[in-house]
Structure formats: structure tokens, C-alpha cells
Amino acid sequence: MSFLPLLALLLGVQVAISDLYARRVSNRALLLASAAAVAWLCVQWAVTRTGAPTAHVLGAVAGLVALLPFYAIGWMGAGDVKYFAVLGLLLGWTALLPVWIIASLCAGGHALCIYAVRRVRPMIPLRLQFLRDTTLQHLEHHPAADQIRRARQGRVGIPFAAYLSLGALLWVVRNTYAVSP
């Protein structure tokens, strides 16, 4: 496995954990990964005159341009947009559509589950509702729940960056270990 897909996987793990835990994507991690990718692409191109960085630069621009409208209308966080642009830089523009499709399907499934739970909740028998409420009250006062609540600082929503990480992981594994016909 080459350096850039490996870097994409490592960044994906960090982003997924951060997004699931705090609903936040670290600018520092994105900047470090971008700097490492640009340095790697420049050195590779200067030394071997192969692997022109065009596909990677186009990937970064396409990733930013593709998701920026969703940020502008409030459907997505800025961290998701920046992370998608960095994925474009790391993996090239050809990875963006499959990664986006996988992430969107996962996020759509997540949204459908939330919607279904809200619709089914009134149909639950009262005894089960009481048990659920009691369990949630116990979990709500657990130190880990308090820590997560403090880390999120009121941020809610679907962890799209975590789903982008999953899409990137699947794309890298498929392109690295796929059997050619």
C-alpha cells in the first residue's frame, strides 16, 4: 500500500473517532495530512517525474466544490466539507464519487433509523416505555455520558465525516486488494 492511501486510512480513523465522540473534525489533523500529502506528491514528482499530482489537486478542488453548497445551506458542517477535500487530495478525484455514495447511503440509513424510532415510540407499550425511560435516566447520569455531552458542546447531527471515513476505508481496501479479472 502506498503512502497516501495509508495516510487516508490513518486520518479516517482519527476523524471517525472524533466525529462520533464529539461531532467535531480536527482542523489540525486535516492540515497535517494535507501538508504531508503535498510534500509527498512534490517529492515523488520531483524525484521520479512520475505520479503527477494533477488527479490529487483536482480531487481536493472537486471535493471542496462538491460539498460546499451543502454547507452553505446548513445541511453539513464545515469539517465534513474540509475532510472530503482532503480525501480528494489523498486519494485523487476518482475516489470521491464512490466514497460520497457510500457515506450518503450510510447517513441516509442513519436518518431513517432516527425517523423510525420517533414514529414507533408512541406505539411502544407503557411498561416498555417505563423500562426504556428508567434505563436512559441511568445512562444519562453515567460519567461517560457526561463526558461525551461536554465534548459535543451541544452539537448534534449525523456524523457524516465518520461515514466518509468508512467510504474511504472501503475504497482503499477495494483498490488495494481487489483481484483483477
What are the functions of these language-model segments?
Residues 1-181:
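A membrane-topology feature that recognizes alpha-helical transmembrane segments
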